[in-house]
Amino acid sequence: MNADEKHVKRVKIRLHELREASDAAELDKFLARRKGIINVEVIADFFTVTVTYDDRLTTPGQIIADLSSIRFTPEGSTILND
């Protein structure tokens, strides 16, 4: 594992709701523009988003705050240790 790889983390965030496919697309596009975000996987059926991020540039708390700022209400989060 190189130095950069050890800073790559994943967090799974459960949202209050994702009403439509357009919500998932909006969420994906919004997060992709945020600093430190490497990848976003949205599972609309289960109201979850898995975010791969660089822990030197952002934190799960910041990602959750960003989601809250655009009307997606996080219900909880789980740090994934791969």
Task: Write out the residue ranges for each language-model feature.
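A generic structural motif
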Residues: 47-52
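Short glycine-/aliphatic-rich beta-strand segments at the starts of folded cytosolic domains
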Residues: 2-18
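Short amphipathic alpha-helices in soluble, non-transmembrane regions
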Residues: 26-31, 62-70
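Short, thiol/selenol-centered motifs that function as redox-active sites or metal-ligating centers
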Residues: 13-31, 35
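Short acidic amphipathic segments
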Residues: 28-46, 73
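Conserved short beta-strand edge segments in small beta-sheet-based binding/regulatory domains
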Residues: 70-82
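Long, contiguous binding/interaction regions
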Residues: 3, 42-43, 61-65, 76-77
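Helix N-cap motif at beta-to-alpha junctions
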Residues: 53-58
